[in-house]
């Protein structure tokens, strides 16, 4: 595995995972099974109010080729074919959705010790072309992410970022939405043994002069149980507890309250993931 600055999508990922991953207000159930031939089948269902959504995902691996096929309750078929290392540091990804004939996309990723590059293009007459790159090291890296609409003949996305890593600290600064949104994130691993960490995500929108922030923390009560909490500038406070009750099988309970409308009921989410 190549060690380097990673891809553009990796910038700020540690802070995002701490602040947003596993928080939900729905009821979700996931079960995975594995055959002796290496085929993995994952079935999941999510209850959103009175609406129930479900999907079945089948994953097949053959040497360095992985095929994922997912069918949802709307009879949509999503297929992703990933080829790992057709050349050193390269990953090729083909994805498409049936019945949408213009949903196909090809993506190439390249990881180097001092660079990470990703490029994708839609498989249609006038596709959107996306290109992102990160240049630097594990400690300091600079990145850019742009999209070009060949039909309109103009840039539809232009983002830039810088990422800094120092021991147990990770900081990132991003400029998104064509320079309108400035965001900064910070992640600090306080105690790796207990998985204790804090994170913050702050944003400023120049067009509206609006500021937002999310502050969160996590801590492992024991090797199998983790608790997390976060607050936002809008007054919403969330907490979750996640327990690995058997190897690779997780139960997660999360809640959210609006401190500015405390009379309202808290939102409760439950997630159960079963793996053999």
From Swiss-Prot:
SS bond list: none
UniProt keyword Transferase, yes or no: no
Gene3D superfamilies tied to this protein: Porin
Location in the cell: Plastid outer membrane
Residues of the signal peptide: none
Keyword field: Ion transport, Membrane, Plastid, Plastid outer membrane, Porin, Transmembrane, Transmembrane beta strand, Transport
The organism's place on the tree of life at top rank: Eukaryota
Cellular compartments per GO CC: mitochondrial outer membrane; plastid outer membrane; pore complex
Main location: plastid
Keyword Phosphoprotein attributed: no
Gene Ontology molecular function, alphabetical: porin activity; voltage-gated monoatomic anion channel activity
Protein's job: Forms a channel through the cell membrane that allows diffusion of small hydrophilic molecules. The channel adopts an open conformation at low or zero membrane potential and a closed conformation at potentials above 30-40 mV. The open state has a weak anion selectivity whereas the closed state is cation-selective.
Free-text note on domains in this protein's UniProt record: Consists mainly of membrane-spanning sided beta-sheets.
Family membership: Belongs to the eukaryotic mitochondrial porin (TC 1.B.8.1) family.
The protein, known as: Outer plastidial membrane protein porin
